[in-house]
């Protein structure tokens, strides 16, 4: 039997009146049932823990299967044998006594989506029982999601939601209050933590714990007080030096066990599968080696230990999505000791198709480090490694292009697949210069999250970049500053509309076909796996998703509500059932 997951991160609840909601939350909790608003119903209710097993021979028939091959063929059937696509066409595939036939009944099937720039390993390390709130649109939906999560959380354990959401996404454009959190979860501590540094919010049970910790002997000589306000608010920390939200995070992290991390890792994989994400290029972010410290923020993890729970599950045969791990080097030291040792002693692209090392990304040294950063680019080229740099404006992109050109005069990088990520601004000249060096552009589709001024164009210029002919992909940059759910970012790419309903990206929209192609076949190039994943073609690994609605025909707003009815990875059904 394959690993089949039903993610516990969001759970389905009936829509109730406010009085019914409060009464049930204060009693035994809200039962699981159908009928949760579409923004919340991103995966089925939780089931039993999945079990390992080999891929099954499958025939998927009577569907609308978008292959994303060179001709964008749409076929009706797919045969899967030994974890690979055996055929994709319009004739009934051959079958044996051991073949399972699944009637798609006209449903839409697409290749498994690929995240070309993400921080999913950070999600796998979240403390507490993390609850996905990135799909909620109001305080009421937040309450329903938390109350539903409560049902599967043991008494005394923290219910958390850390990163991936922003108050812009909620109709009230504010945090829930302590009272509102109490209405949802009166008997377990709750902590919601925004982006990298907070601020955060807790309920009465959580405030009681934090108040006691503040009043007691310090658990670390450098810790600051959480100082939760009467309304549950916890002030943001700084990027360095700690602060109230970082102290709250530290208290949860220091009690997290390895089994807790394995559970969080399983939850992260299950949620990804539930929204159709089957492969990820992880970008680390702000690596911080050594023991936990109260100054560390949500994006600080030990880059040498953060993969331990994922590796353990991989050894047990329990990983259900693909992971490629990049190495971010964040040193300003002119000697670049860590980068040099990494390039000298690490293998890039080492592992198997379910879990392997990547290369350098999302940078080899901080972009603002001047000569140190330029030397880091040279060292990566000298070692023959793939390289990435994330840029936040046109000046940074100009700096990267000039550095790549300088390095390319000394070492040929044209076959190494060097990249630039995010790219909110661009010029045709810079694109052409990148293309001449064999580079690719990963377009960040996440700026709708913080956009609140309809007069400000947020980028990236999807249309300009896609029309250039350079190798291109699209990403969401979850799970700190943006959601993991790819459909929220695809919606922005095809509409240019932010959370306030304002069009904030000019005329830079992609077609639906283009956007999804970039999130599948396009992104496979950035993982060096275009011959294995990204399209539904004979010989490729069997990663595909049966959607709950037709992405190509539903109204724009429903794109954000798409979820997977069934996700197949490596020929195994890892989410849902038909």
Residue ranges and their predicted role:
Residues 38-48:
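Signal peptide processing junction and immediate N-terminal pro/mature segment
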Residues 344-354, 411, 434-436:
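Acidic (Asp/Glu)-rich catalytic clusters
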Residues 1-20, 30, 34, 40:
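N-terminal secretory signal peptides
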Residues 352-362, 439-446:
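Non-cysteine beta-strand/loop elements that form the S-adenosyl-L-methionine
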Residues 23-26:
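Internal alpha-helical transmembrane segments of multi-pass membrane proteins, especially GPCRs
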Residues 378-388, 392-418, 422-424, 428-435, ...:
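His/Asp/Glu-enriched, well-ordered alpha-helical/loop segment
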